[in-house]
Amino acid sequence: ETDKGTIECEQVVIGAGPWARDFWNMLELPKTANIKGKDGKMHVTDMWTYWMLQEGVIGVEPDFLKTNDGKQPPVVHVDSTAPLYSDKTKKLLTDKIWGIYYKPDIEGLGVQGGTSPYIVKKHFDQVNVDPYGIESPEYQTTDAFSEMWCSALAHCQKRFEGKSDLYRKGPSGGLGCMTPDSFPIFDRFFENVYMIADANHGYKMIGVGELVAKEILGTESDLLKPFRFNRYEKGELHPTSNSPFPWS
């Protein structure tokens, strides 16, 4: 049912990113997951956890990261345990594991990227996803983020040293909705609802649409089998990453 009336269909496909929680609740699916541990015991955890994804842009020249032969560079992702010092004050920012990613901004504003996100310390039903992104009055990147990210850029590539003042201040970032193990769920519910809860893996999901379409038409995918919802109760979990990013 919608504000425009009832829409009938044979199959519903839900791929709603950070709004996965809302559709999950509409379907009255469980708010907790039963997870079978290595010890054989069942553990109960919240079905969803929201993370705040912090991102920004440093206003360097558009070709600042071009390769020696003039081509566009790849997305750079770095996880490190090296001490990180401020590019401005040289003070220690962290001596714990940290991570960043960066690439040329698609609008030509410089270099865009982010740091490892942080957990929103609220029950998932209390998190306001809307208004989303730059429109959110509650979830925005901080000054601490800009100092950390710009300093990490300088740590990774000397060409960024002394460039922290070029950071473009403004609203940025957004929420991510993570599953209990931070890996996606691809599964069918109530016979004709297919859920793609991608846990913000983004670019890694490029090939999923075709696999999901084939499953809906009756050809089960061996690649998607490990991502069924019942993996939690069966204890068929994915490896735990040591990365500070929940989707790595």
Give a label for each model feature:
Residues 119, 123-131, 137-248:
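C-terminal catalytic lobe of FAD-dependent flavoproteins
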Residues 2-139, 154, 160-162:
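Flavin-dependent oxidoreductases
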Residues 1-9, 191-198:
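Helix-loop-beta segment of a Rossmann-like dinucleotide-binding subdomain
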